[in-house]
Structure formats: C-alpha cells, structure tokens
Design a protein with these regions (language model features):
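C-terminal non-catalytic interaction/assembly regions of soluble proteins
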Residues: 2-160
Length: 160
C-alpha cells in the first residue's frame, strides 16, 4: 500500500486588536460604505510616514457581515448595524494604535446630513478596544509519500 503523511504548519503574521460598535443612525447606515472608505483613507493618510504594515478590516453586521460579497440580499434596509473594526499589524502596539485611530475617526466622522456631533457609534464594552493576540495563518501544507508510515517517527522505550 502507499502511505502518506500530511504536514501542516502555521506562522505568526502579527497581532490583532478589535473594537466592536453599533449604530442606529439611519443617515449613517445609508452611507456606511462611503464612511468606511473615508475612515480607511484618513487612517492610511495619518500613518503614511510611520512605515506601519497593517491590515484594517471593517465587518458590518446587518449589511453583508456574514456572507460578504456572496450575500444574495443586495439592498437590505437595516435599522441598526454592528461594526467590528479589526486591525492586524506587526506589533501589538501598532495594532492598538491603528485600531484606536480607526475607531475614533469613525466615531467622529462627518458626513452629509449628519445630525449627532457627539458621536456616531455606541460601544458595548469599555474599554472599547481589546487585544486578540497573535494571528496565525497556514504556511505549509504538504503530503509526503513514504513506504513505512512509522519511519519518520522513531519510538524509544526507556525503563526507569
């Protein structure tokens, strides 16, 4: 028979910080895509000279938050949105900094028709940002064909 051994590996790609918020403002909800892009652009501009490598992700629950682009309901009209701001960066400090900037920018982001100037978001947790630790991705997936499935795993029995 042909034996195979599966090898898998993961590597750390950075550190994650998350902020969870919500909004019920119908004007903000109607403009959420433009607001997210505006926040993303402002954060990128603010940190352009720092040399940070990061990934800033917004998941909007109530509007494609679960299925993303595969969502079949294209013109939903939710009365509230859950917003998860997620940052993965090279260090925890950088992830914290970018997440805080994105959260604060979105909280006070100006948009046409805005009425509330005290803040656009509600936060279920205080503090609003929290560490989610190291982030890993698969870095190796390999199948080895061997004649003897035990040859790579020697066993030594020692009697004490």
């Amino acid at each position: 028979p042909q034996y195979t051994i599966k090898l898998e590996g993961a590597k750390c790609i950075g550190y994650r910080t998350v902020s969870v918020a919500g909004t019920r403002d119908p004007i903000m909800i109607s403009k959420i895509d433009d607001i997210v892009e505006g926040v993303r652009a402002r954060v990128a501009d603010n940190y352009r000279d720092k040399g940070y490598k990061y990934n800033l992700n917004f998941t909007i629950y109530g509007k494609n938050g679960v299925m993303g682009d595969l969502e079949p309901v294209k013109d939903a009209h939710p009365h509230e949105l859950g917003i998860v701001i997620e940052v993965v960066a090279d260090t925890q400090e950088q992830a914290d900094t970018i997440c805080a900037s994105a959260r604060s920018t979105m909280l006070h982001y100006g948009y046409e028709g805005r009425r509330a100037t005290a803040g656009n978001l509600a936060f279920p947790f205080s503090p609003s940002d929290f560490h989610a630790g190291r982030v890993y991705v698969f870095s190796m997936y390999h199948i080895i064909e061997v004649e003897d499935p035990t040859s790579l795993f020697p066993i030594d029995i020692v009697t004490l």
